[in-house]
Curated annotation (Swiss-Prot):
Catalysis: reaction(s): tRNA(Val) + L-valine + ATP = L-valyl-tRNA(Val) + AMP + diphosphate
Subunit structure: Monomer.
Full protein name: Valine--tRNA ligase
Residues the record lists as binding ATP: 571
UniProt keyword Aminoacyl-tRNA synthetase, yes or no: yes
Family: Belongs to the class-I aminoacyl-tRNA synthetase family. ValS type 1 subfamily.
């Protein structure tokens, strides 16, 4: 066929001897992409199926989380494509505001010694586009390596022209509907990057700090219940005293409730501030009095709103003390309710220097009661790396409550389903307590806010300046300046499912593929991305009846991939594994360089080096993409975090080898032979009928697992059938036929070999696409298939007529009998190749029939010299026995083993196990080890102890058996 992948040599007599993923994967992917197999089939009469990849940051490179989620998505897409659906899997990247701006700022600083301000806004943005052209494609190149069958011609970028138009359209419409407004509120402020940031970009770190107890004198001669003329407030941030506008006490607190409504004199500043009754003050905590600084603390901001307190901002955007405070009322309007004076000695101080100066002044005035050590959680910016400051700023907000109502109902009424279901509760708890969303960022890179200001400060919103002038009758003489801010990247990615299909145009793609079918995402962004997509999509997308349209019908949530000890993978821990290093392999030297080069904390390098050398003394072997994908699927138990396991990866690499070698065996016994394709009598052996029945049951179970997103079960079902039933049993069971079967029997077995292998390759294809396509290209001709690719072949369907119950039960019995013989060989240390005499005692009619019909079969596979049915009442000679259904298997021991030698050997084995059991029990009895060692290490020791005890018990049973001979 002209469309056969060029690297697959059709003239070779069979598959290469060894499975070499490095040689087959990349040429095959290039072939698939070139042939256009990843595109939708365009048949709109067929059901459509669509997944949008969560857009990774354009600055990023592929990590295990991406590999995990994309394996799941590609498995789903390939599975649905093979069922004939019109499938679209669309990819794209996110412009990643802060991350990208910082990458390019660092680049120009390192290469040119310049800042973005040296360039100016427009030139700096050009520089970013230039960088994107050179480096922005890294992650999509890596995605191709995973075998992702993405329609690359439809790849999108959140800043491309179509998406930028959609973003403006959404902003303008929401503003017209009063769902976007500008307001002065408290935000997470990064003083280094000088921008508002989202909660997701805040990293909370545990820290040892202090709690300062400060005295605030009561005004007008008031006294506490204990007769003191001051209140003591406890704070971890004394510098914010300068911005206090109240002191809260619990209204039920007997010590202070009579003081509610009175005032204190704020030290250092001298202003009178009220004492308020508010539940925020906890009677049991600290002194029971809480200073309220609405402009510098999120909780205080809420208290301030409840009591209409003014807000006093004492910090600049750099985090220094202002020379004059800004005073606002609860609505963010400037007010002169309080003086804006800040004592001269604090003006211009950096915030942490101000902290020391404020404490020193309190001490000097005799108002520092005490200082206690205190464990606290400090918010840091995950990119700037400095302490985040709650800051009162003018920002743009989305009024979310009306949008959230519809989005909650969509999940409540089942239009959107979460897998696993328990994540619905997380979604509800966030959505029912939703705050307005701050969507502006003080950056240059991003979607610039489509708002303009005249010289009087009036705001005009429109798609562009020309529209603003036209709609508001503003002549050329009116000077307008565009808002400097850009939109939060989550705003544009919130439109991802419909903007990427051409909205606001009513495109064919939008009609065909929206709503999309499923979104695969990590639970950490349910609120930041999933919930916002649901809110925005349902507001803008309506079906033909005007009903809000959901962005997707299913949300599949994944857990995190952790290291083998359950630790989160991070650069600072040095435990990150690059998925492509497991595909291609990496030397120890290169791995160490990757893990310890360019570290933010170089002092950790030695520890990381030791750990890496211990874990990967020879680096990482190449395993190929299919083995990686199989491992990821097998570990995907819904919604749970996964501890990565290199042993599993090796196991699935061995699985691919096993499938390759089994296929070579099939091809060697069928290529150039009569496989019954052209008629001729066919007789199916019991083994043929059994494997067809087993395979159909496998299809049924596998499809059920896939349809319920149980990729772990699907992978297990595939592994069990392929390795245990097909390779270990069926291929062995075909050998007697191949050696001495009639023409009709040979035809039947060859036909079955091809039929099952070809369908098995289709079944496995969604999870392991490369190896299955490669083998299928060899197998298809034997089945008379002329199609070009396995990707577009029909997915196997369950066929009840192929399930021969008698064949299943008969062969299961034969297997149990053979296993019984093999177990006796192993237990008695009898060589596997030594022919044995076997007898069946007390066989019922069913067992007798099975022996008589399949005697040569059983003898050949169990390597028996004879198989005898003992007459009723015949006890037979002294033997080792095993029970099977309806009979007892006897192997006479006379002459097979030297009793004394064997008992001596077993005694030594038992002694060895006793020593190991004693060692482990000693370790587990050591309280220090159990308390200090990681949980996973302790669990491994316990498992080892149980395994040793079980092995010892088996040896003791063997001793008893041999002693009785």
């Amino acid at each position: 066929m002209e469309n056969t992948p060029s690297h697959i040599n059709k003239t070779e007599p069979s598959l290469d001897k060894t499975y070499s993923p490095q040689e087959i994967e990349q040429p095959l992917y290039e072939h698939w992409e070139k042939q256009g197999y990843f595109k939708p089939n365009g048949d709109t009469s067929k059901e459509s199926y669509c997944i949008m990849i969560p857009p990774p940051n354009v600055t990023g490179s592929l990590h295990m989380g991406h590999a995990f989620q994309q394996t799941i998505m590609d498995t789903l897409i390939r599975y649905q494509r093979m069922q004939g659906k019109n499938t679209l899997w669309q990819a794209g990247t996110d412009h990643a505001g802060i991350a990208t701006q910082m990458v390019v700022e660092r680049k120009i600083a390192a290469e040119e010694g310049k800042t973005r301000h040296d360039y100016g806004r427009d030139a700096f943005i050009d520089k970013i586009w230039e960088w994107k052209g050179e480096s922005g494609g890294t992650i999509t190149r890596q995605m191709r390596r995973l075998g992702n069958s993405v329609d690359w011609e439809r790849e999108r970028f959140t800043m491309d022209e179509g998406l930028s138009n959609a973003v403006k359209e959404v902003f303008v419409r929401l503003h017209k509907e009063d769902l976007i407004y500008r307001g002065k509120r408290l935000v997470n402020w990064d003083p280094k990057l000088r921008t508002a940031i989202s909660d997701l970009e805040v990293e909370n770190r545990e820290s040892k700090g202090s709690m300062w107890h400060l005295r605030y004198p009561l005004a007008d001669g008031a006294k506490t219940a204990e007769g003191k003329d001051y209140l003591v407030v406890a704070t971890t941030r004394p510098e914010t005293v300068l911005g206090d506008t109240g002191v809260a006490v619990n209204p039920e607190d007997p010590r202070y409730k009579d003081l509610i409504g009175k005032e204190v004199i704020l030290p250092l500043v001298g202003r009178r501030i009220p004492i308020l009754g508010d539940e925020h003050a906890d009677m049991e905590k600290g002194t029971g009095c809480v200073k309220i600084t609405p402009a510098h603390d999120f909780n205080d901001y809420e208290v301030g709103k409840r009591h209409a307190l003014p807000m006093i901002n004492i910090l600049t955007f750099d985090g220094d003390i202002r020379s004059e405070a800004e005073v606002f009322d609860t609505h963010g309007e400037a007010t002169d309710a309080f003086s804006n004076a800040i004592p001269a000695q604090f003006q211009g101080l950096e915030r942490f220097a101000a902290r020391k100066a404020v404490v020193a002044e309190f001490e000097k005035l005799g108002l520092l009661e005490e200082v206690k050590p205190h464990d606290l959680t400090v918010p840091y910016g995950d990119r700037g790396g400095v302490v985040i400051e709650p800051m009162l700023t003018d920002q743009w907000y989305v009024h979310t409550a009306p949008l959230a109502k519809v989005a909650i109902e969509a999940v409540e009424n089942g239009e959107i389903q979460f897998v696993p279901k328990q994540y619905e509760n997380m979604y509800y708890s966030w959505m029912r307590d939703i705050q307005d969303w701050c969507i502006s960022r003080q950056l240059w890179w991003g979607h610039r806010i489509p708002a303009w200001y005249d010289e009087q400060g009036n705001v005009y919103v429109g798609r562009d300046e020309a529209e603003v002038r036209r709609d508001n009758n503003l002549g050329a003489e009116v000077a307008l300046r565009q808002d400097e801010d850009v939109l939060d990247t989550w705003f544009s990615s919130g439109l991802w499912t419909f903007s990427t299909l051409g909205w606001p145009e009513q495109t064919d793609a939008l009609k065909t593929f929206h709503p999309t079918s499923v979104v695969v995402s990590g639970f950490d962004i349910i609120f930041f991305w999933i919930a916002r997509m649901i809110m925005l999509t349902m507001h803008f997308m309506k079906d033909e009846n005007g009903k809000p349209q959901v962005p997707f019908k299913t949300v599949y949530m994944t857990g995190l991939i952790r290291d083998d000890e359950g630790q989160k993978m991070s650069k600072s821990k040095g435990n990150v594994i690059d998925p492509l290093d497991m595909v291609d392999g990496i030397s120890l030297e290169a791995l160490l360089e990757k893990r310890t080069g360019n570290m933010m904390q170089p002092q950790l390098a030695e520890k990381i080096r030791k750990r890496t050398e211990k874990q990967f003394p020879n680096g990482i072997e190449p395993h190929g993409t299919d083995a990686l994908r199989f491992t990821l699927a097998a570990l995907a138990s819904t919604g749970r975090d996964i501890n990565w396991d290199m042993k599993r990866l090796e196991g699935y690499r061995n699985f691919c080898n096993k499938l390759w070698n089994a296929s070579r065996f099939v091809l060697m016994n069928t290529e150039g032979q009569d496989c019954g394709q052209n008629g001729g009598e066919m007789v199916l052996s019991l083994a043929d009928r059994w494997i067809l029945a087993e395979f159909n049951q496998t299809i049924k179970a596998y499809r059920e697992a896939m349809d319920t997103y149980r990729f772990d079960l699907a992978a297990g079902i595939l592994y069990e059938f392929t390795w245990n039933q097909f390779c270990d049993w069926y291929l062995e069971l075909t050998k007697p036929v191949m050696n001495s079967g009639s023409e009709a029997e040979l035809r039947g077995t060859r036909h079955t070999l091809i039929q099952v292998l070809e369908a098995l390759l289709r079944l496995a294809h969604p999870i392991i696409p490369y190896i299955t396509e490669t083998i299928w290209q060899r197998v298809k001709n034997l089945k008379g298939i002329t199609a070009d690719t396995i990707m577009l072949q029909p997915f196997p369907e369950y066929d009840a007529s192929q399930v021969d119950e008698q064949a299943l039960s008969d062969l299961e019995w034969i297997k149990q009998t053979i296993i019984a013989v093999r177990n006796i060989r192993a237990e008695m240390n009898i060589a596997p190749g030594k022919p044995l005499e076997v007898m069946l005692r007390g066989a019922n009619a069913q067992a007798q029939r099975r022996v008589l019909e399949n005697q040569s079969f059983i003898q050949s596979l169990a390597r028996l010299s004879s198989l005898t049915l003992l007459a009723e009442g015949d006890k037979g000679p002294v033997s080792v026995t095993k029970l099977v259904e309806g009979a007892e298997v006897l192997i006479p021991m006379a002459g097979l083993i030297d009793k004394a030698t064997e008992l001596d050997r077993l005694a030594k084995e038992v002694a060895k196990l006793d020593a190991e059991i004693e060692r482990i029990e000693g370790k587990l009895g050591n309280e220090g080890f159990v308390a200090r060692a990681p949980e996973a290490v302790v669990a491994k020791e316990r498992e080892r102890l149980a395994a040793c005890a079980e092995a010892k018990q088996k040896l003791i049973e063997q001793q008893a058996t041999i002693a009785a001979l």
